[in-house]
A protein has these predicted regions:
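Short acidic, glycine/serine/threonine-rich loops at helix termini
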Residues: 28-32, 67-73, 79, 169-172, ...
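A generic secondary-structure signal for well-formed alpha-helical elements
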Residues: 5, 9, 37-44, 59, ...
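Acidic, His- and aromatic-enriched active-site or binding-groove loops in soluble protein domains
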Residues: 40-65, 149, 227-235
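Active-site metal-binding motif and surrounding structural segment of the metallo-beta-lactamase
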Residues: 2-56
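Catalytic metal-binding/acid-base residues of hydrolase active sites
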Residues: 23-25, 63, 164, 209
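Metallo-beta-lactamase
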Residues: 1, 51-52, 58, 62-237
Length: 238
C-alpha cells in the first residue's frame, strides 16, 4: 500500500496512524507503515506526541483488549476457521480463488501489532493532524467490539470504518469472531447520519468503493442501517 501511494502521489512522512477498529486486517499491516521505535511516547499528551516528531498510533478505546481477545486467546481456532471461510490457502487460478464480497482476497503477509499511544474515549473528540481536522465517533459493539468513524470536515468526508461497506456484512462470522449487535450497529449508523449527514459529500470505508454526493451518501447509510435493524427486529418478532 505504501509503495502504491509513493509511486502515484510521491513520498510523504507518516504523521500519525489511525486504526479504525480491532480486526486484524485493519491493524496487522502497521509494520509496513512505521517502525516500532518511531511510535510516540504514550505517556505524553496527544499534542506533545504530535509535536515530538514521533508517530502517534490512535485507536478507539478498548482496541488492545479486543484485539488480544480475538487474535491471541481465540487466535488459533479463528485462524484455522478463516482458512475455510476465506479460502486463504487456495492456489490462484480459474478453479482456485474465493472472492469475499468486500474484497477479492485476503492478505497472507506477516501480521504485526502495536499498542496505541493514544485512545479516543468519547464521541465528538477532535484532533488536528498535519493541518487535517478530524472528529471521531465511537461505535462500540458494531462491526467490531471497538470501532470508530471519523469525520473530516474540511473535505466533507466521512470515514465509516467498516460500519458501511456496500454489502450486507456479517452479523455472525464463520471464523468465530464476536457476534455483532444489529440494533446497535443500525443505531450508530443513524447517529452518524444525524451528526454528519447534512454536510457529508463523500463517504468512504475500509473496504469497497466511496459514495459521492450528499443524497447518495445519505441513502447509502440509511439503507445500510435499515438492513441490520430489519434483521434484528424480524429475528425478535419470529
Amino acid at each position: 500500500a505504501m509503495q502504491l501511494i509513493e509511486k502515484n502521489l510521491g513520498k510523504f512522512p507518516v504523521k500519525a496512524v489511525i486504526i479504525s477498529h480491532s480486526h486484524v486486517d485493519h491493524f496487522g499491516g502497521i509494520a509496513g507503515v512505521m517502525a516500532k521505535e518511531d511510535k510516540a511516547d504514550e505517556t505524553l499528551s496527544i499534542e506533545d506526541q504530535l509535536a515530538s516528531g514521533k508517530i502517534p498510533v490512535i485507536t478507539p478505546v478498548g482496541f488492545t483488549e479486543h484485539s488480544v481477545k480475538e487474535n491471541v486467546y481465540a487466535g488459533k481456532g479463528m485462524g484455522r476457521r478463516s482458512n475455510y471461510q476465506y479460502g486463504i490457502l487456495l492456489p490462484p487460478g480459474v478453479t482456485g480463488k474465493l472472492a469475499q464480497g468486500i474484497g477479492m482476497g485476503q492478505s497472507t503477509g506477516t501480521v504485526s501489532f502495536m499498542t496505541p499511544s493514544y485512545e479516543i474515549t468519547q464521541s465528538g473528540e477532535k484532533l488536528t493532524i498535519d493541518g487535517v481536522e478530524l472528529e471521531f465517533q465511537l461505535t462500540p459493539g458494531t462491526e467490531a467490539p471497538a470501532e470508530m468513524n471519523t469525520w473530516l470536515p474540511q473535505y466533507k468526508a466521512l470515514w465509516m470504518a467498516e460500519n458501511c461497506t456496500g454489502t450486507l456484512h456479517n452479523l455472525y462470522t464463520l471464523r468465530g469472531a464476536e457476534v455483532r449487535d444489529g440494533a446497535a450497529w443500525a443505531s450508530y449508523i443513524t447517529e452518524a447520519i444525524s451528526l454528519y449527514g447534512k454536510d457529508a459529500e463523500v463517504t468512504f470505508q475500509s473496504h469497497n468503493w466511496p459514495h459521492w454526493g450528499n443524497n447518495v451518501v445519505n441513502d447509502y447509510m440509511v439503507n445500510t442501517a435499515a438492513v441490520y435493524k430489519y434483521i434484528n427486529d424480524q429475528t425478535l418478532t419470529y
